[in-house]
Amino acid sequence: MAENFWLINSNRSRIKRFSKNNQNKDKFFEYMFIDSGRILGVLGKEPPLMTTREELKVYKARDEWRKLIAQGWRRTKPVWEEY
């Protein structure tokens, strides 16, 4: 299972999951998925509703991570069961 890295926004309503795309066919570049979602109800009671998925080259995903951190997003661990 691939390792996932999670960010949560400052008001704890949105979540992003960064994960490496191990099924990528490109021989020259590595890619990551960025899944975005909304937190429903109380954080930790239900898994987030994942709404979108992007696939970016790793260096662009790192840029996105840094941009989100600068905007106040924080690293978090999932507090819900794996789904």
Predicted features by range, described:
Residues 1-83:
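Terminus-proximal functional modules
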